[in-house]
Amino acid sequence: MKNKPLVSVLIPCYNVSAFVERAVNSILKQVYTNLEIWLIDDASTDDTAEKIKSFDDNRIKVVSFAENTKKVGAVNEVLQNVQGDYIAFQDADDWSEPARIKEQIEQFLIDTELGICFTNYRYAGDKTGLPEKISLTDEELKNEFLNYSYTRVRGTSPTNCPTMMISKAALENTGGYHPYFAGRVAEDIQWIYRILKRFKGITIDKPLYNYSLREGSFSYIQSNGDNAKYAYSWPLLSKIIYKDVHEKIDVLAHENINLLKELELEACEEALIESLKLVNKMKKTYEKSASYRLGRFLLSPWRLFKNKEF
């Protein structure tokens, strides 16, 4: 490859001491070497900061934050200082295959109108294997993100946002993550939505990224029930995108704060109804199980004794 533009790789880190070396080494071992690698410690409480400072490579830049920003604030600040013509992302508990950056750069050099490029991925950890089907073409990606609907994409294998590489033009045009989504599950999707409104996208149909959902990860913490924002973030995102696409209303604009609050309440309501439906479904499934029927049978004499009048 004669033309070798600089690629900035951002690796946000929070309490990932046990995994971060694998993630960073997967970038250091990329066959494409013209990189600047930003290791971003978002106020970890373990020894993550010490781990990332121990790497000895002149391509690495370490940035540490005194207060946790839920990833969004830290990444946005670093994005203001990147020098790369293209920007790639790597989650600190995942890892990339050696050819990932090279393959993505080649796509940008082929198509100068490209603003964002993803790759296929492989599940690692408790769940293994490849996703069943993902969006590959610009048309498919736009259908996934510009017509985003939580109820439509549930049960599918969505595009894996951490695999994305974007052009500097896409960054300058969209500005990074919206601060409203700090600590929510949808921060990547909302930003990608804004990029795909203005630029072409593509997914390389090769598993060049290894994705792990582990207990303690940011994704796990968001989805395990401890984070109240998780329950309604998806339906809320659907409403925000719908308003923007069909009614040309930027719900996140300051002047629309009251509308945002209304949509938050609606999303909470919908999430609660969905949760109750799920609980009811689980209850019915359990009542059909052999263990439930056996329990009822074993307890039937006690119920007769309890109800008997003396």
Where are these predicted regions, by residue range?
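N-proximal low-complexity "stem/linker" segments adjacent to membrane-targeting elements
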Residues: M1-L28
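Acidic helix N-cap motif at the loop->helix transition within catalytic regions
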Residues: A18-E21, D46-S54, W95, A99
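A conserved acidic beta->alpha catalytic loop
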Residues: S26, D41-E50, E67, D91
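Glycine-rich, basic loop-to-helix element that forms the pyrophosphate-binding segment
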Residues: F65-V82, E103
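Conserved nucleotide-sugar donor-binding catalytic segment
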Residues: Q80, E140-S233
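Short aromatic/hydrophobic "clamp" motif used to bind/position activated sugar donors
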Residues: I87
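Conserved donor NDP-sugar-binding/catalytic core segment of glycosyltransferases
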Residues: A99-K133
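Boundary detector for helix-to-coil junctions that initiate low-complexity/charged tails
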Residues: K243-F310
